[in-house]
């Protein structure tokens, strides 16, 4: 019973195949946003990026078959377990507040263009 309860809080290690798939997504997209469709911070992120460029990729973790595993892989790779999880030019940016801070400092547009 204890192992079952523990499984709610501890995810098993992510397979190398899933990690490779996530890395491939990061490497093949200039702007990549992992998000959940119901998340208001994710909507803010999409709106801001859309205002700068139409060229970005979104992965909706809550509708993806491997969404939970992908989110676990992202946590292992970046230390971030929340969404949105944003990458620009293969660099991990962080979440919406990090993106908004870059915009406020005038540093986002040069990254996107």
Predicted regions and their residues:
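N-terminal targeting signals for export/organelle localization
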Residues: 1-13
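Folded extracytoplasmic luminal domains of secretory or organellar precursors
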Residues: 15-18, 67, 98
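Local sequence-structure signature of Cys/Sec-based thiol-disulfide redox active-site neighborhoods
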Residues: 18-59
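Short amphipathic alpha-helices and their capping/turn residues within compact interaction modules
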Residues: 27, 31, 54, 79, ...
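N-terminal G-site of the GST-like fold
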Residues: 43, 53-82, 88
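Non-catalytic, surface beta->alpha helical segment in thiol-disulfide oxidoreductase systems
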Residues: 88-113
